[in-house]
Amino acid sequence: MTLKQFILPIMLMLCHTLLAQQDTIMQLKEVVISDTQLRNFSATQSVQRLNDSVINTNASSLTSLLNYNTVIYFKENGLGMVSSPSFRGTTAQQTAVIWNGININSQLLGQTDFNTLNTRDFDAVSVRAGGGSVIYGSSAIGGSIHLNSELDYADAFTNELRINYGSFSTQGLHYKTAISTDKFSASVSVTRNSSDNDYDYIGQEGKNINGQYYNNSINAVAGYKFSSKNRLVLYSYLFDGERHFSLIFPSEIRTKYRDSNMRNMLEWVGDYGKFTSKLKAAFLQEEYRYFANIAYQEFTFGRVQSIIGKYDLLFKPNEKFKINTVLDFTQNKGNGSDIINKTRHIGAASLLISHELGSRFMYEAGLRKEITNNYESPVLFSLGTKYQFAPFYTLKLNTSKNFRIPTFNDLYWQEGGNAELKPESSWQVEMGNVFTVKDVMFSVTGYYIKIKDMLRWVPTGGLWRPINTDRVETYGAEALFSYSKTLGVHAVSLNATYGYTVSKNETTGNQLIYVPYHKATASLSYSIKKFSAYYQFLYNGEVFTRSDNNSRYNIDAYTTGNAGVEYNFGNANSYKLGAQLLNAWNADYVSVDSRYMPGRNFNIYITLKFK
């Protein structure tokens, strides 16, 4: 990443005067976030927030965090390799990743690789289940993952340093500093992860060959309040990584893959009584280089640069009613070794409403329409209600129409791209039951999703081409449980999730590949004074790896778990020393056919927090 590459998007944003959205939460101190729609228009759906204590318990990758704490299933081509999710039985391209309110799914592949995001760079990670295309656009069918940075406007100066070392020469470094006053707030974090990743296979000869990787990331946020009504905030995230792709057989040619992602966003927010006006400009760049033989310097590449402008106007006449209009424009410019150089323009308009009628009942509604010359986009809608029948029981209902647009690879691949593709579209409905009694929360949500015009690459005349062919029906149930209790110096918490998922091709009646019928997680933590310990449990059910559901090739169900202990040696400042035992049961398992995961291994770390 050169200095020119870093400065250019900032200049582009300043020149475009399309700045954007923000809001405030008043608590003991003022905390500012960008993705305010997540809070204002998600009351009728399930939103699971994973705070910094949960983030720090897990490995730094987004895959590890979500795999052990949510119902989302992940298929991972070996530790640290390509990782893709299945949320409510949908494909990886039907799960949206939202960075501070901006959809960052790849324009080339249509999905996000969850091993290219370091969770410790963010203050909060939230999981929003169900449709969200009315708010967040393409891919938000199964659900969306939200990565948020926060700004505190209070006099403070803090520093955090974490160093870890583990099996297979796995090393990690994370440093974050934050400074703020009542007018200015800024934070910067730097993360480095690397591993030889040469673990031995369990129960058989051989080891993970050519699996080494490293990645670096920088996350920066800075905000300034010009007055009580106007503020400006800059968000920036840079990621650079290299992974050697693990071999199935030692005789295979060794390959590697380089990722470089740059995301910059400038926001202006004006609070004018009942109106909140927001302008946003963002510049995103994704680029990859694939080396088909690491013995040579030749590579293929792909690159997409995106400019996003958004205007957001929120009208809030009182605490019970909100109406939000959003206008946005996106330009994607792509080029690469195997795609035709193309520029795509997309305009969109959204209308969102949230209304509380009394103390027990509220509803949410939304409409969205996109316009582009590349394909015909459907009118999207969402409608949800929430009613509190009793202090301990709340019922939620939600229905929505969502979609996923074709990617640059789908449309413009030189050897088979199809410019006549239509977006995938889905209709879904869900019912959530939430029970809350003192320190216990338990929720059960049932859902049904119907997807049409699903994209598939199929052989046509000796050439593979994408077409709109499949229809998919998905239904199931999700259960979430949480309990926390503090008695004097003792604190205990228990969290659990369970997902039952049926996702079948309507033509064949077969379950989609890499979608388990069952997944369950649980975590138990206990602390007394300066000592704490935890245990994590993960169960993934059997999955099909062939579209004809031939059970001969199934991946068996597996159970694994992690354990850890930590002690704080500090007083005014925090000096924590911790140890983790990963795959504590030494389970022999894979999540992708023939891509073995490591057995029992360890990690030790030290975390220093000082002011």
Task: Give the residues covered by each predicted segment.
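C-terminal beta-signal and adjacent terminal beta-strands/loops
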Residues: D198, I451-K452, L494, G541-R546, ...
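Flexible loop and strand-edge segments within Gram-negative outer membrane beta-barrel domains
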Residues: S195-Y201, E205-S217, K225-S306
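Outer-membrane beta-barrel signature, preferentially recognizing the C-terminal barrel domain
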Residues: P250-D271, Y393-T394, N398-K452, V458-T486, ...
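Extracytoplasmic beta-strand/coil segments of soluble accessory domains associated
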Residues: T63-I102
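Gram-negative outer-membrane beta-barrel transporters
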Residues: G358-S359, Y448-K450, N468-F544, N571, ...
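N-terminal periplasmic "start-of-domain" segments of outer-membrane beta-barrel proteins
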Residues: L28-T57, S84
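N-terminal periplasmic accessory domains that precede
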Residues: L62-L65, S83-S86, I98, T112-N118, ...
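Short acidic/polar hinge/loop motifs at secondary-structure boundaries
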Residues: F74, I102-G130
